From Swiss-Prot:
Function: Catalyzes the stereoinversion of LL-2,6-diaminopimelate (L,L-DAP) to meso-diaminopimelate (meso-DAP), a precursor of L-lysine and an essential component of the bacterial peptidoglycan.
Protein family (similarity comment): Belongs to the diaminopimelate epimerase family.
EC number(s) stated in the UniProt entry for this protein: 5.1.1.7
HAMAP family linked: DAP_epimerase
Compartments, record wording: Cytoplasm
GO BP terms: lysine biosynthetic process via diaminopimelate
UniProt entry keywords in alphabetical sequence: Amino-acid biosynthesis, Cytoplasm, Isomerase, Lysine biosynthesis
Site residues, Could be important to modulate the pK values of the two catalytic cysteine residues: H161, E210
Site (Important for dimerization) residue list: F270
Subunit structure: Homodimer.
Name of the protein in its database record: Diaminopimelate epimerase
Amino acid sequence: MLIDFSKMHGLGNDFMVVDGVTQKVFFSNEVIKKLADRHFGIGFDQLLLVEPPYDPELDFHYRIFNADGSEVEQCGNGARCFARFVRLKGLINRDRIAVSTARGRIVLQLEGENQVTVNMGVPQFEPGKIPFRAQKAEKTYLLRAQEHTVMCGAVSMGNPHCVIEVPSVADAPVATLGPIMERHERFPERVNVGFMEMVNASEIKLRVFERGVGETLACGTGACAAVVVGISQGKLKERVTVTLPGGKLTIAWKGPGQPVYMTGPAEHVFDGQIEL
């Protein structure tokens, strides 16, 4: 079966994007792993699948698969690429796009110069909604992870995040502490691990070890998580520039009960076909 796809990226966080509206597709875990291989496949951090809406009030359903084949609930950089893809492919002729994900609904707004703003929804701090094993919600948690003692924030942006403040992201133990924290026993569905350096109240630097992927050049939900944790701890203002290895995102959050808005680029790289 010959499948059409597009290769896209958001700040270097790269995706294989597939139209599941006009063509019938199915991807097994093994097929996704092979396609994700950067030497023998197409190579990507996540596969994004556009499906018809489950709800008639929405435009599409948005599915995300990590390079290891696991399906996840949300991907912010992917959401921006999703919006640009459906517009480029003529699947919709509006700039405002409402989609469902495995964890809820998000609204995508196409702006000028390949920029997309995404309403990422309301962050969840309640442990049961992250999910995270704790008696009650706290602004910071003290966790033991092998020989490490870690102070972190925990939040869900539709997927679970642990945010660790570090003096310098350049020296952060992403490769060593990242995989340990990803599988920490208090995160029953594993977790994305962010290492955040405070530059000032309006700017942070961030590196993210993504669940099921490893470190990526950018993580949209990770940027949102880091900012809302920083704001909740009284360290950041309502609008923050996040510098990731792949570039910059703007994150805005007005506080508890309010949605998080993420603005950043979505780039189309090439189109292709592959035999499945």
